[in-house]
Amino acid sequence: MKKIDEYQGKKVLVMGFGISGINAAHLLVKLGANVTANDKATPKNNDIVDDLEADGIKVITGDNPISLANEGFDVVVKNPGIPYDNPLVAAFVKQGTPIITEAELGWQIFDGHLVSVTGSNGKTTTTTLTQLMIAENAKHQVKYAGNIGISFSKIAEDLGPDDTLVTELSSFQLLGAPTIHPHIAIITNIFSNHLDYHKTRENYINAKLNITRNQTKDDFLVINWDRDEWQKIAQRSQATIVPFSRLNKSHEGSYVEDGMIYWRGQEVMPTKDIRLIGPQNVENALAAIAAAKLSGVTNDAIKKVLTTFSGVRHRLQYVMEYQERLFYNDSKSTDIEATEVALQGFDRPVILLAGGLDRGYTFERLVPYFKKHVKAMIVFGECKDKMKDAGNQAGVPVVESENAITAVPEAWKLSEPGDVILLSPANASWDQFPSFEVRGDKFIEAVEELTGKKEQ
């Protein structure tokens, strides 16, 4: 941990508890700040409040009182999920109070080697693969943190100058991280996500580009080269560009040619040996390979990781095989692109479980993939009618169900030996579940109840 004094004696407001907010509040106390912690909700667990107050932190819950804007805070550390049009946040913006996220705080105290990953899809898998690959050859600590469910600042506290930290960073986190400066930045892809938060696609892209904003030619931007738009986005970086390409559009970084993965012209391994399924995971592997090779990792270490790593929970996760049916949990697929890619990973007939929060879009784009890959669909949630329309256009039998739990026995009734039963909703979970993780866990529980087996 790097010693800094910029918070000594400063008044700091932490907005939003959560894992990152609580850790940030305690860290700020260590850094000498006078900390107030505020959450709009009232925590069900009183231990959270007790722990904060025991550290000398003033706690305000149940509201984001606008009066806090008049208390002379020097800095606001905001939960990434709180939008900037929140009245209290907007008041701080208007008066020019610096607003950062916990990721910025983590960067400020970190003095090791930083690798950061962002993108619309594939962030967590790429982050995990990169950390595992670098750790295989490392003589010092290699950890991961960030949007992967582990506080950036908490891990940064425990690492030294020779250690490496691989961070997954969302657009929400990056928007409040103005000085972050990874030596290696990775952009897996950029689609049109979270426009309810960012308002426009350009705002979303600009938030993502904060990952490379402070890089120089001595740093590296690893970026997907398979779309012209992404190549143009790369030109906005001052870093040395290192492309990765599944579609063989560049030989300057990592790429695939005739089923073989190459790094700058040298063979690494065949794509068929990657344990993770699907073209999206080839792309994730290519991104991780590029970062690993830039970090001095050997091909043997890369092969070891890619031939053994079976995936991240809720991300095209293999659950089990039962009576010759394969069950997969892809609850993290909360947009059309993710489900489109997931379907392309299977060469067996798919019984698709899809639906969720209605964000106002329709699903015509999925029709060709339904025609090619989907045998039947079970639809649920707010957008089930729109999902049903797309299934009907594809000529696929569609059954309506209440949710991802009740859909499991319905899918079983329609399945035959050799089929895949896949939860890949193409929508957020918030109409029925508090998170995609809970939705995925409940799906797995339903599969376990149906089969009488535990997930593998």
Swiss-Prot record:
GO terms for cellular component: cytoplasm. It catalyses: UDP-N-acetyl-alpha-D-muramoyl-L-alanine + D-glutamate + ATP = UDP-N-acetyl-alpha-D-muramoyl-L-alanyl-D-glutamate + ADP + phosphate + H(+). It holds the Pfam family AlaDh_PNT_C. SUPFAM superfamilies: MurCD N-terminal domain (SSF51984), MurD-like peptide ligases, catalytic domain (SSF53623), MurD-like peptide ligases, peptide-binding domain (SSF53244). Pathway: Cell wall biogenesis; peptidoglycan biosynthesis. It is an enzyme of class 6 (ligase). Signal peptide: none annotated. It is found in: Cytoplasm. GO terms for biological process: cell division; cell wall organization; peptidoglycan biosynthetic process; regulation of cell shape. Gene3D superfamilies: Mur ligase, C-terminal domain, Mur-like, catalytic domain, NAD(P)-binding Rossmann-like Domain. One of its GO terms (molecular function) is UDP-N-acetylmuramoylalanine-D-glutamate ligase activity. ATP binds at residues 119-125. It comes from the Bacteria. Coiled coil: none annotated. Cell wall formation. Catalyzes the addition of glutamate to the nucleotide precursor UDP-N-acetylmuramoyl-L-alanine (UMA). Belongs to the MurCDEF family. This is UDP-N-acetylmuramoylalanine--D-glutamate ligase. The lineage of its organism: Bacteria, Bacillati, Bacillota, Bacilli, Lactobacillales. The gene is murD.
